[in-house]
Amino acid sequence: MAALWLQSFSLLVLLVVSWPGSQAVAPAQHLCGSHLVDALYLVCGDRGFFYNPKRDVDQLLGFLPPKSGGAAAAGADNEVAEFAFKDQMEMMVKRGIVEQCCHRPCNIFDLQNYCN
């Protein structure tokens, strides 16, 4: 019951702030899971919204220069460095609405960027 009330309250705040002619500044807030989806439905309306769950990191790793020799020839140190770089590359690529609005607070203008 409390979760439903919190969800309804969050949507009401977004609705009031996004009402045309409203002089209030949209407060940035964390929106995750169903709260994020509901906020997108509210903000985007009939236009709908798009969502790309996770970009393929392997496509971007194809831009890296080929390795000279294998991990055995290069030594264990290079193998560790290679895996650390791949993790760092994945962190740089994984950006989207979840990172923008769930991990960090976002406002109504951020949500509008995901509308069709």
UniProtKB/Swiss-Prot annotation:
<feature type="propeptide" description="C peptide">
    <location>
        <begin position="56"/>
        <end position="93"/>
    </location>
</feature>
<keyword id="KW-0964">Secreted</keyword>
<dbReference type="GO" id="GO:0005615">
    <property type="term" value="C:extracellular space"/>
</dbReference>
<comment type="function">
    <text>Insulin decreases blood glucose concentration. It increases cell permeability to monosaccharides, amino acids and fatty acids. It accelerates glycolysis, the pentose phosphate cycle, and glycogen synthesis in liver.</text>
</comment>
<dbReference type="InterPro" id="IPR004825">
    <property type="entry name" value="Insulin"/>
</dbReference>
<dbReference type="GO" id="GO:0005179">
    <property type="term" value="F:hormone activity"/>
</dbReference>
<feature type="signal peptide">
    <location>
        <begin position="1"/>
        <end position="24"/>
    </location>
</feature>
<dbReference type="InterPro" id="IPR022353">
    <property type="entry name" value="Insulin_CS"/>
</dbReference>
<comment type="similarity">
    <text>Belongs to the insulin family.</text>
</comment>
<dbReference type="InterPro" id="IPR022352">
    <property type="entry name" value="Insulin_family"/>
</dbReference>
<dbReference type="InterPro" id="IPR016179">
    <property type="entry name" value="Insulin-like"/>
</dbReference>
<keyword id="KW-1015">Disulfide bond</keyword>
<keyword id="KW-0372">Hormone</keyword>
<comment type="subunit">
    <text>Heterodimer of a B chain and an A chain linked by two disulfide bonds.</text>
</comment>
<dbReference type="Pfam" id="PF00049">
    <property type="entry name" value="Insulin"/>
</dbReference>
<feature type="disulfide bond" description="Interchain (between B and A chains)">
    <location>
        <begin position="44"/>
        <end position="115"/>
    </location>
</feature>
<keyword id="KW-0732">Signal</keyword>
<feature type="disulfide bond" description="Interchain (between B and A chains)">
    <location>
        <begin position="32"/>
        <end position="102"/>
    </location>
</feature>
<keyword id="KW-0119">Carbohydrate metabolism</keyword>
<dbReference type="InterPro" id="IPR036438">
    <property type="entry name" value="Insulin-like_sf"/>
</dbReference>
<keyword id="KW-0165">Cleavage on pair of basic residues</keyword>
<keyword id="KW-0313">Glucose metabolism</keyword>
<feature type="disulfide bond">
    <location>
        <begin position="101"/>
        <end position="106"/>
    </location>
</feature>
<protein>
    <recommendedName>
        <fullName>Insulin</fullName>
    </recommendedName>
</protein>
<dbReference type="GO" id="GO:0006006">
    <property type="term" value="P:glucose metabolic process"/>
</dbReference>
